[in-house]
């Protein structure tokens, strides 16, 4: 199926886990992020100022992009978890070293969500501007690959590895629902840049906002390609001045998708012949934690919320 993400709708990806070995252990979702060139919006009037977009991905990008993970066998759902749940689980249960490793794997690093303060910079965003060099403009945020661990019961402990060898007539399926792209990054509101420039504070710029893809100035194609050079590369744009960047057809290439190459990676384990026979002939029982997530809206001030629980409850989390 498609390996790209939708701009305005949830994206669903279904993975059938093949029986390449006897046990399934660590499982990851791999997502490739594109290079990001965050351009600058030139002044349209004499009293206006230059307005940078200052594109950045949201914090905890790898887990926040996951809306839901559903694990099932033979049509029966075994576990459902969300990216928010995994984030809370990491914050609560992981030690500092494991937490730092998890953040690097899932893109929760300054190079992705705070480029103005990464690579030795201090509040200096690396805005992309068209260049006459052979290599072109340097990306504001370099593309990289995220490896997002699926924190299901079988991936947290090797003793709980999923027994694929016991699946004689059924298959293990993992279904991932990812949030739309417009919920995964923020930009400056370049249309609300002030004109009150003072030496002590510089030019006032707009607040960070979620992009509105109904606005031509917020289209994703403006960030996944270098800014066109109207001087040295006339084939890249129909215009001759950077001030025309506000025009809807300033960018000739207006494709919003990129090669996200979304796929699953898993760690398998092999058993001896005696162990395979034991798994295949004897019933295997596992204690699986079911995750229930409830959203409470309009909680203002001191209020009581109703917690509906049943059976044995190991813990609650609020966030």
For each feature predicted by the language model, list its residue ranges.
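Flexible assembly/topogenesis modules
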Residues: 1-319
């Amino acid at each position: 199926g498609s390996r790209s993400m939708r701009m305005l709708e949830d994206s669903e990806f279904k993975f059938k886990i093949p029986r390449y070995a006897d046990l399934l252990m660590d499982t990851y979702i791999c997502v490739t992020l594109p290079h990001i060139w965050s351009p600058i919006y030139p002044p349209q009037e004499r009293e206006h100022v230059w307005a940078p977009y200052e594109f950045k991905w949201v914090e905890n990008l790898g887990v926040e992009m996951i809306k839901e993970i559903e694990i099932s066998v033979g049509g029966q759902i075994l576990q459902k978890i969300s990216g928010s749940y995994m984030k809370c689980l990491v914050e609560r249960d992981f030690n500092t070293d494991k937490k730092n490793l998890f953040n690097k794997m899932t893109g929760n690093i300054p190079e992705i969500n705070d480029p103005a303060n990464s690579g030795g910079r201090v509040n200096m965003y690396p805005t992309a501007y068209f260049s006459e060099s052979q290599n072109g403009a340097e990306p504001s945020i370099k593309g990289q690959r995220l490896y997002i661990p699926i924190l299901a019961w079988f991936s947290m402990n090797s003793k709980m590895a999923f027994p694929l060898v016991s699946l004689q007539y059924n298959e293990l399926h993992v279904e991932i629902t990812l949030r739309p792209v417009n919920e995964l990054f923020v930009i400056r509101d370049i249309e609300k840049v002030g004109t009150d420039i003072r030496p002590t504070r510089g030019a006032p710029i707009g607040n960070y906002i979620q992009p509105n893809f109904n606005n031509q100035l917020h289209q994703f194609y403006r960030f996944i390609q270098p800014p066109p050079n109207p001087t040295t590369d006339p084939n890249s744009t129909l215009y001759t001045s950077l001030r025309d960047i506000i025009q809807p057809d300033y960018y000739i290439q207006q494709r919003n998708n990129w090669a996200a190459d979304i796929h699953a990676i898993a760690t398998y384990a092999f058993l001896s012949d005696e162990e395979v026979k034991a798994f295949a002939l004897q019933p295997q029982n596992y204690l699986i934690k079911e995750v229930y997530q409830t959203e409470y809206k309009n909680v203002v001030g001191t209020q009581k919320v109703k917690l509906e629980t049943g059976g044995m409850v190991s813990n609650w989390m609020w966030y």
